[in-house]
Amino acid sequence: MRIVLLGAPGAGKGTQAQFIMEKHGIPQISTGDMLRAAIKAGTELGLNAKAVMDAGQLVSDDIIIGLVKERIAQPDCANGFLLDGFPRTIPQAQAMKDAGVVVDFVLEFDVPDEEIVKRMSGRRVHSGSGRTYHVVFNPPKVEGKDDVTGEDLVIRADDEETTVRKRLDVYHQQTAPLIGFYGKEAEAGNTRYVKIDGTQPVDQVSKQLARILG
């Protein structure tokens, strides 16, 4: 079962990725983790990637595709894998297809921008422990204070509304076109494309995924 997850930051992909991994026993493949592992292992691709990164440049699609192919050939991917955060662009998706990487399911988590802004800009964190709250969905007992220590809660820079909106803009420019790409792939019978309403409660989304993935 080879799965690609699509959806804006804050759409709930991470939560459902955990559910899918546990239920189906397949690993989640993150390009960041792969890059770090390849650099640490000193593989040829890893050394190439390190040279590019040390020069302050972006790692090319060719190197990333090479890493993906290396990674999915490992024994723990025998029953499938879950790709999150890759491919991000149509050239990456095309290169993956050209490299013979088959995708069984593309799952798009659809959540309106304003809902994502509400979700992410409402997060509050206790710096000392990492405990996370939400002003709407999971408020602390005392506004702005950690339940355990009573210390102040902070907003992470990533969760500031302006940052969230910038990340959404990048997603719509770069990654949203993949929806069209994989839609066509599904029409051609090369994959199954499923759009999921990410505004549903978490357990409802998990149940829907269980029905889709079997």
Swiss-Prot record:
Chain positions recorded as AMP binding sites: T31, R36, Q57, L58, V59, G85, F86, P87, R88, Q92, R156, R167
Localization annotation: Cytoplasm
Keyword Nucleotide-binding assigned: yes
Chain positions covered by the region annotation NMP: 30-59
Record EC number: 2.7.4.3
GO CC list: cytoplasm
Pathway the protein takes part in: Purine metabolism; AMP biosynthesis via salvage pathway; AMP from ADP: step 1/1
GO MF annotation terms: adenylate kinase activity; ATP binding
CDD domains assigned: ADK
Disulphide bridges, residue numbers: none
Enzymatic reactions: AMP + ATP = 2 ADP
Annotated region (LID), positions in chain: 122-159
Binding-site list for ATP: G10, A11, G12, K13, G14, T15, R123, T132, Y133, Q200
Keyword match Lipoprotein: no
Biological process annotations from GO: AMP salvage
Top EC group: transferase
Any matching Pfam family: ADK
Keywords assigned by UniProt, alphabetized: ATP-binding, Cytoplasm, Kinase, Nucleotide biosynthesis, Nucleotide-binding, Transferase
InterPro entries cross-referenced by the UniProt entry: Adenyl_kin_sub (IPR006259), Adenylat/UMP-CMP_kin (IPR000850), Adenylat_kinase_CS (IPR033690), Adenylate_kinase_lid-dom (IPR007862), P-loop_NTPase (IPR027417)
Primary location class: cytoplasm
PANTHER family: NUCLEOTIDE KINASE (PTHR23359)
Subunit structure: Monomer.
Similarity remark: Belongs to the adenylate kinase family.
Comment block on domains: Consists of three domains, a large central CORE domain and two small peripheral domains, NMPbind and LID, which undergo movements during catalysis. The LID domain closes over the site of phosphoryl transfer upon ATP binding. Assembling and dissambling the active center during each catalytic cycle provides an effective means to prevent ATP hydrolysis.
Function: Catalyzes the reversible transfer of the terminal phosphate group between ATP and AMP. Plays an important role in cellular energy homeostasis and in adenine nucleotide metabolism.
Protein's recorded name: Adenylate kinase
Name of the gene this protein is made from: adk
